[in-house]
Amino acid sequence: MSKSESPKEPEQLRKLFIGGLSFETTDESLRSHFEQWGTLTDCVVMRDPNTKRSRGFGFVTYATVEEVDAAMNARPHKVDGRVVEPKRAVSREDSQRPGAHLTVKKIFVGGIKEDTEEHHLRDYFEQYGKIEVIEIMTDRGSGKKRGFAFVTFDDHDSVDKIVIQKYHTVNGHNCEVRKALSKQEMASASSSQRGRSGSGNFGGGRGGGFGGNDNFGRGGNFSGRGGFGGSRGGGGYGGSGDGYNGFGNDGGYGGGGPGYSGGSRGYGSGGQGYGNQGSGYGGSGSYDSYNNGGGGGFGGGSGSNFGGGGSYNDFGNYNNQSSNFGPMKGGNFGGRSSGPYGGGGQYFAKPRNQGGYGGSSSSSSYGSGRRF
């Protein structure tokens, strides 16, 4: 079966975000550069709908994933005299996850079974790129495997490619894969945003975000009452009453009470979820002690957060210009509403200081300033 006859791979896997564009770059010049590596089914420079001025980023979509890989393997790219940053486009759903837009080389692999060894992980994940380190986590006291591992690659694109694919099977078992974000990476993300000048977002204008002036989903912050690791544990990473994907109904990700690795429910809690017996993702000191004992959210330093005044793609669809890379209703990624993404407290801040992951008091933001 020829390429043209084969069924198309999902669009999300064929799409690249291109950041750091010159304001002179047009759809045509972007296309003429990136079509060197394959057939483009879509190519757009995102523009302000009123002024028509470039926002400094765009998207290209190839006909096949193989062509996307070829383009990424050809980095660095220079378009109209400016070095640009291509990354695999993050879906609307995944853009809500903490650290979705961070560049990291390590993944967390959860839900792996007792009989899974290092070679099983290597056999599966080496298809995505060169592996540097594999760590299967064990209990310090008993030596028993804790049900999760970390895999470090030599290139962030390997991680980006892995996390946009929803399902992974290692040693015959389904597992959950996400970016591994250490405390240091979160701190450096926060400080790097502070150093990037001002109140704009990733290509945004006046307090606007990654794509404009509204928030990712108007109507309230993404994490509901308690927020991501919020001190009250009232809301989950996924809404006011839900935990992450339904894990841990009553608390946030590492929240004070129950929740995602909280005391009684959630991912890795004593009752149910990955990694049971209180050891799961973030529980009992695992995954870099993400919950930090509860009370601290996942955000940045005191007044500055990872998402600032606007949001990831707030103004409309990646494509008001004709595609679906757009907002969701009911929750903003980095919105200006009163409840920040990090709940009452922050990961590296005083408890309850009101600036969370993209919270309301931000003066800096995700890729703030004009653009990269």
From Swiss-Prot:
Changing residue 314 to V: In IBMPFD3; reduces binding to UBQLN2. There is a cross-link at residue 113 (Glycyl lysine isopeptide (Lys-Gly) (interchain with G-Cter in SUMO)). Its main location: nucleus. Residues 14-97, 105-184 form the RRM domain. Keywords: Acetylation, Amyotrophic lateral sclerosis, Cytoplasm, Disease variant, Host-virus interaction, Isopeptide bond, Methylation, mRNA processing, mRNA splicing, mRNA transport, Neurodegeneration, Nucleus, Phosphoprotein, Repeat, Ribonucleoprotein, RNA-binding, Spliceosome, Transport, Ubl conjugation. Residues 197-216, 328-346 have a biased composition (Gly residues). The modification Phosphoserine is found at residues 2, 4, 6, 22, 192, 199, 337, 361-365, 368. Residues 360-372 have a biased composition (Low complexity). PROSITE patterns: RRM. There is a cross-link at residues 3, 8, 78, 179, 183, 350 (Glycyl lysine isopeptide (Lys-Gly) (interchain with G-Cter in SUMO2)). Changing residue 277 to K: In ALS20; uncertain significance. The modification N-acetylserine is found at residue 2. Identified in the spliceosome C complex. Identified in a IGF2BP1-dependent mRNP granule complex containing untranslated mRNAs. Interacts with SEPT6. Interacts with C9orf72. Interacts with KHDRBS1. Interacts with UBQLN2. Interacts with PPIA/CYPA. Interacts (via the RGG-box) with the HOXB-AS3 peptide; the interaction inhibits binding of HNRNPA1 to the intronic sequences flanking exon 9 of the PKM gene, preventing inclusion of exon 9 and promoting inclusion of exon 10 which suppresses formation of the PKM M2 isoform and promotes production of the M1 isoform. (Microbial infection) Interacts with HCV NS5B and with the 5'-UTR and 3'-UTR of HCV RNA. This is Heterogeneous nuclear ribonucleoprotein A1. It comes from Homo sapiens.
